Amino acid sequence: MNIQLSPLEARVIGCLIEKEVTTPDHYPLTLNSLTTACNQKSNREPVLNLSEAEVQDTVEGLIARRLVSDESSFNSRTSKYQHRFCNTEFGDLKLNQQELGLICCLLLRGAQTPGELRTRTNRLCTFTDVKETEAVLERLANRDSGALVVKLPREPGKRESRYHHLFCGEVDMAAFATSSDNEANASSQYAELEQEVAALREEVAELRALIERHLG
């Protein structure tokens, strides 16, 4: 895969993709609108507090790489930006609406399960069910031209595995596995503590009963 993004570039691209679909009347976006979208509290993980200068610097880097273009008119005082991330005339990355919706949501929120993605992409595309969502994710993970997403180790106590995009580089699977193991150990320790507390409560109840009988 040729496109590699920094976390801030991923946020900017994700926002431009999202707003192109959800608010077409206000797209391309001004710098102010794009900054607001980047700092949005809903459908963002993590929530950021970027300045316009930070967003501007990121956009200029993306323009230099031809992943974003300035669509403002010649005599306009306000720049308006649109993404050229995919589906451009000469670009190699071609995505259908479902694939683009999933990639957009992964860029904006990081690792998610197929169920979460089906719900969170409802304004971007449509999936019949979770199985269809997972099938599209698997297609993105097994592209002949290079994987765009990867399936992560399943977390303890979870029914579904999460998927993560690969536009910010390879995912450290060992770190995710370690995190899952730590969560499993923590869950096991918590269960043991609960059992110990329950046993102590029984002992206290028995002692109370003995004292009451003795005093009675």
UniProtKB/Swiss-Prot annotation:
Family matches, as SUPFAM superfamilies: Winged helix' DNA-binding domain
Matching InterPro entries: DUF480 (IPR007432), WH-like_DNA-bd_sf (IPR036388), WH_DNA-bd_sf (IPR036390)
Pfam families xref list: DUF480
Gene3D superfamilies assigned to the protein according to its UniProt record, in alphabetical order: Winged helix-like DNA-binding domain superfamily/Winged helix DNA-binding domain
Coiled coil: none
Origin: domain of life: Bacteria
Entry's family note: Belongs to the UPF0502 family.
PANTHER family: UPF0502 PROTEIN YCEH
Protein's name according to its UniProt entry: UPF0502 protein VC0395_0676/VC395_A0574
The species this protein was found in: Vibrio cholerae serotype O1 (strain ATCC 39541 / Classical Ogawa 395 / O395)
Taxon lineage: Bacteria, Pseudomonadati, Pseudomonadota, Gammaproteobacteria, Vibrionales
